[in-house]
């Protein structure tokens, strides 16, 4: 993923991957691709070097790049979008429920207004809701080989 995206999500996706790898030492590890130079050529080079079973991405063109460079999805490699929305159609991924996040943000703002709080809070709150899996066709269920 582009480095600015990793920073924007406070490295939480990377932390999740590294935590999963640390708690499953018997399974093969893969080096995540986070770069300031995130483009088709660098993604393809990473895929050729790492040979992942599945690619998790938040960057729209990655699936197109994979297919354009000869990977058959999901036959050769699966693809999962980390920020799936209905417009993504057939793609498998995580629906972060942006409408519900927006509603929670409005509730938080209403709370601050009702309590006559202004400015940046001393202790800021973060809104996190559980994502919903969208099955799609690009990431079928498979047994883990290890």
What are the residue ranges of the model-derived segments?
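Bacterial carbohydrate/catabolite-sensing allosteric modules
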Residues: 1-146
